[in-house]
Every structure is written in C-alpha cells, then in structure tokens.
Swiss-Prot record:
InterPro entries for this protein: Bacillithiol_biosynth_BshC, CC_BshC, Rossmann-like_BshC
Coiled coil segments of this chain: 248-268
Class of enzymatic activity (EC top level): ligase
Family: Belongs to the BshC family.
SS bond list: none
Entry's EC annotation: 6.-.-.-
MF terms in GO: ligase activity
Function according to Swiss-Prot or TrEMBL: Involved in bacillithiol (BSH) biosynthesis. May catalyze the last step of the pathway, the addition of cysteine to glucosamine malate (GlcN-Mal) to generate BSH.
Name this protein carries in UniProt: Putative cysteine ligase BshC
Keywords: Coiled coil, Ligase
Organism: Bacillus cereus (strain ATCC 14579 / DSM 31 / CCUG 7414 / JCM 2152 / NBRC 15305 / NCIMB 9373 / NCTC 2599 / NRRL B-3711)
Domain of life: Bacteria
HAMAP family: BshC
C-alpha cells in the first residue's frame, strides 16, 4: 500500500473550522492544539465518573462479543482515574454500513494511540453503537455493482416496526440469503469463501441488528483494543438514569440553549441542521413497542400528539422502574456520552461536526464543556487497475477528487476533436433559425394559411439537426469507447453516484478483494490530522 494526501475543498462549518476561522471555532470549547488537550485532561480530572460500574458492564458486554485480550485490558484500565477515552459513534449498519464507519474506528484507534504517547496518560478507543436508533432505512442496505451501475440493495425485514436497532430482531436465514446475493456481485477471489465464513460466523451469533454489527466490528478489529458500547443496552441504561433525570429537570434550559446556539450559527452565516419540534424535551420513551419523542405540553410530558401524558413525578418514577424505556435523541446523545465517559476527544464526520457546533450552549446548561471535536480521517482506496486507468488518461490522482468525473470525461473527449461538436451545431442551429425566420415571414406574406405548417417545418429541420448531432457524438464515443470506459470505471470506483467512495462502498468488497487482514494493513499507514484526504493505492 502507498498513501498520499491531497487537499480536497470543503464547505461550510467543516471548512472554516479546519481553516482556523475564529468565529466558528468559538462555537467549540477546545481548539485542536496540544495545550487544549492538556487543558481538557485538567478539566476531566475535576469531574467524577461511575468508572467501576461502567467497567463491570463493558467487561460483560465485550466478553460476550468475544473481544480480544487487548480490548478487555483497555476496559479494565477505564477503572483507573487517569484513563481517558477517544470516542466516535455510528448506527448499526448491516455489514457495518458504508466504509466511513470503518474509517471512524481507524480514526479513534489512531488518535487514542497518538494522545497516549504525547500526553503520557492511558487513552482507550471507544466506539458507541447508536443502538437506540429506530430509523431502519439508514441501516438496512448496502450498495453493490450491478449491470455497470451502483444499486442500493435493501434487506427487507419481515416484521418492520418502529423499534430500536438493539431490539429489532434479525432473521438470520433471510439475512444470510441477502448477504450471499451481495457476494455474487463481487468477483470470485481466493478470499471469497473465507470472507463469507467470517461474516456468517458473526451472523450466527446475532439476534438483532446491533448484535450483527458489534460481532462483525469486533472480528474486523480483533487485536486493536477497541471497546464497543451499545447505547441502548439495558444495563448501561440503568447507569444513565441519574443523567436522564437531570435532562428532564433542565429540559427548558436545554431547549433554550439549543435555540440560542442555533441563532449564533445563523448570525455567523451558516444554516442549522438540527431540526426538532419546538416543544421536544429531547428524550424518547418506548410506548406500545415504538420509540416516541416526548414533548412539553402545558406542564405535562406527552407522546403521540397527546395520546399519552405524564407528570414530572410520573416520568421520574417510570425512569426508576423501567430505565430501558428511555433513550436519547440527536441533541441529548452527545450529552450522555459526555456523562458516561471521560472523553478526551470526540471524533465525527463533516455532518456531525456541523451539528455539534449547534450544541455548545446545550452542553453548558447541564454543566459540561464540549470535548475537543476532531474531524475523522477521510480515505479513498485506489485499486491497481484504476491507477492504470488514471495513468492512461493522463489524469493526476487528485483529479477525480477536485473535479466532477463527468466533466473530466467531457473535457478529455473535446480535446480529442479538432473542432468542438457543440459549438458547430449551435452555430448551425442559429444560422438555420435566422434563415427560417425570414422564410416564414415570406411564406406568411404570400399565403398566411401556411404559417403553422412553416413553423412545424422549422421544428422538423431542428429535429433532424439534433439527430445528426446525436449520431455524430455516438460515433465519436464509439471511436473512443476504450478510453471512455476508463472514465466510467474511475467514477464507479472513486466517486460512485457522484459521492465519495467511503459513503457508498462497503468494506466487504475490499475484504473479498484483498483478504481478511485488509483493515489491519490499512492501519499500518501513517495518517495525519491536517484535514487532507488520504488516498491509498492498493
């Protein structure tokens, strides 16, 4: 493997944050400097965490996942007052979801290792599985290549309901059939059987979406020391109830903090991305087997548009009696992470970084500082045949990331032709239109009744001109078919559906192509945190 860095233009909050724009950086409590991380350590030492209870739960959970010894040692280390975490999270996508989930894990492993060395304290990597999430459309699919197109392949649940991913049962047999269909779209390699068995071993141990995700991530990162936590685990929820009570007691301040911070974001010229109901208390409650967002209504906490109503006292009582019924939303999830873990740094993608900029005052209302927010590593893999295509077309490795591939293709094609086709035909159409306008005026003057026919005559001439143009372009494309197919392959591999590779392709494709140690070999590369995009030639 060979790694290169390229500067890819970013937009909005992420671009300004990485470029050191003070206005947006003021929406975060720590900069990304070594002094800021030292200050964060100092601030965390002023707080108390329920470390021993957390260690007991994480040991049990990660042991059930058959995590490696390095993971269990890291969990035990969390019991020490001088151990901290680097954390990131994601929904429990089938087959781990898009590549960026894998890249988030690589990011926390990398940063935890670096900060442990530079700060001289124990730093462990934690991945927070958003098990409470009930949006199955976000996690029930992957993309595959079919008939020279990227196709979204959905796993259809036989019994869909608005339950969390931790509680949504997974039909092992149906999922196995779905996975086999996906692997049929991959080339048969020396690794295919091993990878299928690897995935199936994880599936056989799983009852839910979160189970499958957690077993697969544990196996992929078996020797890394990665700690997994299911945010909707009932045992974890018991530990979180004191903070749920705090959120409920301060829900008005949380609402106001969000509104005020979003106003700050608007004044800085950005568009807020968190959209919630104005009366939301930012906590979900399980009602009739569904996650229901609680809202404030005349001093009561209601769900399902008032169909269910609770007083403050009733809600607190229910939290103590049935903790597992409650879960966080997009606003309170970061707060709960901060409550549970001594977080040295949070790692997020571009969207997460933008929405965290809207939470600063929310953190402050519950007495927390927002942890340092570090943009995750972004990575694209370039296979050997794609590198050859780039070379053959005399394209730089950075070109597909800095330009639209369709535009690159059009520019290349126009350079192969001495005179631009579009310009010639546009000129011809204009000249014909001018001549025909004069001709129509003459016809109407001699015989007004033929005016409509003359207009149709012009349309037919234009249709023939356009047909000629299409046929010429088709013949030119056929002449350069080999080269144009190279552009299609480049787009398919590096910018599928016009999006970054890591937002579409799944890690199983690369495990199938390069073996089960693919991710381990990726992690051997040197990565930097300067905001540049990492291109890895395979």
């Amino acid at each position: 493997m060979e790694i290169k860095e390229i500067s890819v233009p970013q937009q909005g909050v992420v671009a300004d944050y990485m470029n050191g724009k003070k206005e947006i950086q003021s929406c975060f409590d720590y900069m990304l400097t070594e002094d800021a991380f030292k200050q964060r350590l100092h601030d965390l030492r002023e707080r108390e965490f329920f470390r021993q209870d957390l260690v007991a739960h994480l040991l049990e959970y990660n042991t059930k996942l058959q995590a490696g010894e390095s993971t269990l040692q890291n969990v035990k280390a969390l019991g020490d007052e001088n151990t901290y975490v680097v954390i990131a999270g994601q929904q429990a996508g089938l087959l781990t979801g898009p590549l960026y989930t894998i890249h988030k894990v690589i990011s926390i492993l990398q940063l935890a290792k670096e900060k442990e060395e530079s700060l001289g304290v124990k730093v462990v990597p934690v991945f927070w599985i958003a098990g409470e999430d009930h949006d199955m459309d976000e996690i029930n699919h992957t993309f595959v290549a079919k008939n020279k197109k990227m196709k979204k392949t959905i796993f259809y649940d036989r019994n869909p309901k608005k339950a969390s991913a931790s509680e949504s049962e997974l039909s092992v047999e149906d999922c196995r059939n779905w996975i086999e269909e996906i692997f049929k779209t991959y080339p048969e390699t020396n690794f295919t059987k091993d990878v299928l068995k690897f995935v199936d071993d994880a599936l056989k141990k799983s009852n839910t979406y979160v189970d499958f995700f957690a077993h697969l991530i544990t196996k992929i990162f078996a020797n890394s020391g990665l700690i997994l936590v299911d945010s909707h685990h009932p045992e974890l929820r018991k530990l979180e109830i004191p903070f749920f009570k705090r959120i409920i007691s301060k829900y008005k301040e949380v609402q106001e903090g969000l509104r005020n911070q979003q106003e700050v974001i608007k004044e800085l010229g950005y568009k807020p991305i968190i959209e919630t109901k104005s009366h939301a208390v930012h906590i979900f409650m399980e009602i009739d087997d569904e996650r229901v967002l609680l809202e404030d209504q005349q001093g009561k906490f209601v769900g399902k548009d008032g169909a269910h109503s609770f007083s403050y006292e009733e809600l607190i009582e229910e939290m103590e009696r049935n903790p597992a019924r409650f879960s966080n939303n997009v606003v309170t999830r970061p707060l709960m992470q901060e409550y549970v873990f001594p977080t040295l740094a949070f790692i997020g993608g571009p969207g997460e970084l933008a929405y965290w900029s809207e939470l600063q005052q929310v953190f402050h209302t519950v007495g927390f500082q927002m942890p340092p927010v570090v943009p995750r590593l972004t990575i694209t893999y370039v296979e050997r045949d794609i590198a050859t295509d780039l070379f053959d077309l005399q394209l730089r490795e950075s070109d597909p990331f800095l330009n639209d591939v369709d535009k690159l293709r059009e520019n290349w094609l126009s350079n192969q032709i001495e005179e631009p086709i579009d310009d010639h035909f546009e000129k011809a159409k204009k000249e014909i239109a001018d001549i025909h306008t004069s001709l129509q005026q003459f016809v109407k003057k001699i015989e007004p009744g033929l005016g409509a026919f003359a207009g149709k005559n012009e349309l037919k001439i234009n249709e023939q001109i356009e047909l000629l143009e299409r046929m010429l372009k088709r013949n030119v494309e056929k002449k350069y078919e080999v080269q144009l197919n190279k552009f299609r392959r480049i787009q398919f591999a590096l910018r599928p559906l016009g999006a970054p590779q890591e937002r579409v392709w799944n890690v199983c494709y690369y495990l199938n192509q390069f073996g089960l140690d693919f991710v381990d070999r990726v992690m051997e590369n040197p990565f930097s945190w300067d905001g540049k995009h990492h291109v890895i030639k395979l």
